[in-house]
Amino acid sequence: DPAVPPALRPSPVRRPLPPELPREERCLEPQEPACPACGGDLKPLGEDVSEQLELIKSAFKVIKIRRKKKACARCDVIVQVPAPSRPIERGIAGPGLLARLADAVCDYVMSMGKVHVDDTPVDVLQPGKGKPKTGPLWVYVRDDRNAGSTQPPAVWFAYSPDRKGAHPQTHLAGFSGLLQADAYAGFNPLYEEGHIREVGCMAHARRKIHDIHVRHPSPTTTEALRRIGELYAIEADIRGRPAEERQQVREARSRPILVGLESWVREKLTTLSRQADTAKAFNYLMNHWRALCYYAGDGWAEIDNNIAENALRVISLGRKNYLFFGSDSGGDRAALMYTLIGSCKLNGVEPEAYLRHVLAIIADHPINKIKELLPWNLTIPAE
């Protein structure tokens, strides 16, 4: 009844998980040696029991979690280990069940030969420490619609406890092709191996000049932004055209502008103080010039990495609804859900309807046909 407040409505009764599935019990005992409120002795009070469905090496099993409760004999305070995090609040699906879907998205994203990469920091709680740490969420995007591709776009997120280059190097260990990203030094070992080609982000370089122009506009920054603006005007003209046509147009129209921009910037650097902000922005441009110009000779590449930056907007939205991740494992769970939700959004699929349908059928779906459940492959029945 819509008139009945949610808090007063009876909760639906969930059917128990099939008894024939193998089960594993995990007993979580409170770690407190004494009452945290008054220091009194703790005595057993009972336990809360829950079950969650998990996929272990392509076979389902039920994880029965017993969370022991203890009560203080002096002040009646109750202590108990918090319930383990789940991908879906109050859901029975464990993270491993949905992880196969996220893995399938990852395989798809990495299979094309071009990927957009970026990262954004998130706050993560550290048990026993007074303040949270920062752990990045990495985003990997496959989206070639600007080059006329009809292949579905997709996004894969990965969490890491720090921003060391070893993490994206691991993520991209089996990848070969174009890597469009900013000039993060952690990617350099990948470029040195030879099977990954660096493609730069003109928007990143332009932003450095634009920020200076906003604070201290000058004829030099005005001219630099005008020249870069001409490059973006060409991109607007050819957006959605086939890669071969984009390459031809860029060679004919963009390449001469890039050649002129390089000569002009190098000349300006001879007249600017090395400590000047404009000189620093121009040096960034020249230091990464080869990667920034690569797109002009390849119709599949983009002028910038805005595709990845746009995919990170969902994280910015999330920050308005939560303050931090509760743990590193919580970061992994968030990356999994962002992968599925982000890929739904890129393909015009309503995320809540998709997840509701997938969770209803995934337990009975053949694991070797998991790709059938990807957002762009699945037909969601009308409700």
Predicted stretch roles:
Residues 35, 72, 101-103, 118-120, ...:
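Short, conserved catalytic/metal-binding motifs centered on acidic residues
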Residues 87, 92-103:
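Structured secondary-structure scaffolds
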